Amino acid sequence: MKSKFKIGIDYGGTKIEGILLDQDGKQLERKRYSYERNYLSGIETVKKLVDEFDKISEEVCSVGVGIPGFSSRQTGIITNANSLWLNDKPFKKDLELALNREVRLMNDANCFTLSEAVDGAGKDYKSIFGIIIGTGFGGGLSYNKSIIEGSNQIAGDWGHQPLPYPTKEEQETKISCPSNNCGRPLCAEQFMSGIGFKDRFNQKYDTNFTSEEIVKLDLEKDPRANLELGLYEDRMARLMAVMIGIFDPDAIILGGGMSNIDRFYKNIPSLIPKYTFSNKVETKVLKNLHGDSSGVRGAAWLWNNV
């Protein structure tokens, strides 16, 4: 649908956020509402946001929605969603009925990647790999400012691939993948998500820190935090080396809570060449530009080609 204004929706586990952009990507309004953690409440909350933005713009706006899961092209059924009440539901169809318009739906990691590719940290690069490091560990691929979904719609979704070149300690880990849909051994998410990182630290040192507190300890020169962040950086370099070997992006852009750790952008690039079949790696490792707004902006940009 053609519209001068674009609405982006970020469907989170406890809150649903919306943004209204003009045709140049300027933010006109942004709102966030809590909702009851069930299917109907989620649809009602999205409708509330869309109705409010339509009123502000005085137009029937295009709507893009980022979800923590995947929507089948064949059936429209949601799978592998962390918000479990979405699974096995025809969410796109039901949302279109509620909003009385076509809706574009995409995985939230892809929305983040698209946002940074269109007018974020990756706007000057042709090929982008975007990574979200937060509660989970997801990824997305973009080429020429368009998302590459792949035949199975999981291109770049590397969170549940096995950690490459595992050390003996990693092979002996007793921490399971935090995702409800996984359970595989050596799953990358159990090592790389914010939850996985702090769980490994706390189990090893018999502590009860959050990931943010561990990062603060590192800034205070705590040797435990420095060691564990160093191990984390090495794991990230191994994973990035695999992606570089397959997709060879111009830039890798980090998002999510752990993307705010400044040392990553110095240390990880220097480690990647150890694991690539190349003496020099030109791929840039960058921090996102849009911060917490990136995913919801990317959802709005799902209508960028219209």
What are these regions (language model features)?
Residues 1-62, 71-75, 93-103, 116-125, ...:
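ATP-binding/phosphotransfer module of carbohydrate and carboxylate kinases, centering on a glycine-rich
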Residues 30-32, 81, 150:
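Residue-level detector of high-confidence beta-strand sites
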Residues 34-37, 86, 154-157:
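A short acidic/small-residue loop/turn micro-motif
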Residues 67, 74, 143-144:
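A cytosolic small-molecule/anion-sensing beta-strand core signal
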Residues 76-87:
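A charged helix-plus-loop insertion that forms the helical arch/lid used to bind
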Residues 105-109:
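Short loop/edge segments at beta-strand edges and connector loops
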Residues 125-187:
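Glycine-rich phosphate-binding loop of actin/hexokinase-like ATP-binding domains
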